[in-house]
């Protein structure tokens, strides 16, 4: 079987909903990343077999193909867009790696993009062509049958209650995320991930959701979103805009082209769970991944779990017995942000730049009751 390696990875800084990137369509968010790869890896770009991107709340119309054309890549390069909700970006990386393993191609660009600010409004179509009632807008599509399709906030509350994750633990984890993120922005670790872009004449190179100077006590002052609950705006991620691209190729070709380091894809798993508890998906996903590769949690140096809500990450940490020295060691989405279709690819990008780590996992909890996880080693 061929081996797939990630040899390059970059992302935009993530803008908050209605923030600096609010006027940019998904293809415009991706364009500078494509152009960066085109300029830096010109010889490789001509060999691309496919572009695979995750996207969740966009306009449809295969954003992967549209974006590569917008960026001036060759007409002969195809593109495919994947929607596995929040797991789309990680799914895109796994898809490209699996295609290389299967011998279907040798060079792929994978990643994801999301503009929550530019997401189209959704209106239910009337049952009758003679309908006279006012249009009915809705926030999102259904992820599961009606009685098993909680809002994401209610889903986080369900997980918190089931796994006994207190408000205090949630706030403490959120504070940790902001502190670790701020620390790794300051020391330059996170800046390695980010390609600075120019937006309206200004350089944009810092995640907008980060609140590095909020005192710990302030997290406890936020009211729960649901009366009597524990999930607040402070221990939940924000809605965000941003894009991520990774260059993935067959290992022997990577060596031939002069790439000397990166991530080797070992395996990936996707599972289903009770859709009332969507955030717990990483638990069986990571467990199955470890079992299939004859590993234990202690064998993994770094585990990146997307921080949609403190409640679900703390629950996963406790269920899997993950130590703080393993989990989200540069912070996470509670501070950096969660651009849905790009977030899984961002986790892999973060692992790519942890040059001193050898064995790593990226995992996502997914709306509708899913979880995915991927195992990487350094090459």
From Swiss-Prot:
Name the CDD domains for this protein. thiolase (cd00751)
Q: Which GO terms describe its cellular component?
A: cytoplasm
Q: Which UniProt keywords apply?
A: Acyltransferase, Transferase
Q: Answer whether the UniProt record assigns the keyword Transmembrane to this protein.
A: no
Active-site feature positions: 86, 338
Return the InterPro entries for the record.
Thiolase (IPR002155), Thiolase-like (IPR016039), Thiolase-like_sf_Thiolase (IPR050215), Thiolase_C (IPR020617), Thiolase_CS (IPR020613), Thiolase_N (IPR020616)
Biological process (GO) annotations held by this record are: fatty acid beta-oxidation; phenylacetate catabolic process
Q: Which residues form a coiled coil?
A: none
GO terms for MF: acetyl-CoA C-acyltransferase activity
Q: Which family does it belong to?
A: Belongs to the thiolase-like superfamily. Thiolase family.
**NCBIfam families from the entry?**
AcCoA-C-Actrans
This one is known as: Putative acetyl-CoA C-acetyltransferase VraB
- Organism, by scientific name, is Staphylococcus aureus (strain MSSA476)
Q: What is the lineage of its organism?
A: Bacteria, Bacillati, Bacillota, Bacilli, Bacillales
Gene from which this protein is expressed: vraB
